[in-house]
């Protein structure tokens, strides 16, 4: 079983991968950031979208990349858009760094692929091909 999604579907995919041993690989497009960056107003967004995803009390102990990292050492692909207004690159890069540290500590850094593509908040044909290639490589 693999989990894949874009936007809120991506959020669900990495959450499911982190919490279920049945999921053997995961792909998430346009949903990874650190909470501190997502909930700030300094990026000029009218709506920062993070409050809907804040699990009460959990942020005291774990941030989004910490939760996603519970999936290590599973093969996981994260794709972000460099012009995605919902997920500022500062937070994406910070989250990716945290996750790479965990996969590295698990001896499986090669199982984590993180990308920042020239795109907005979308799952385009290039992303879909990357997902299919990643899953073909990791779950066949």
Stretches found by the model and what they are:
Residues 1, 76, 112-113:
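Short, conserved active-site loop motifs that form the nucleotide-linked donor/cofactor pocket
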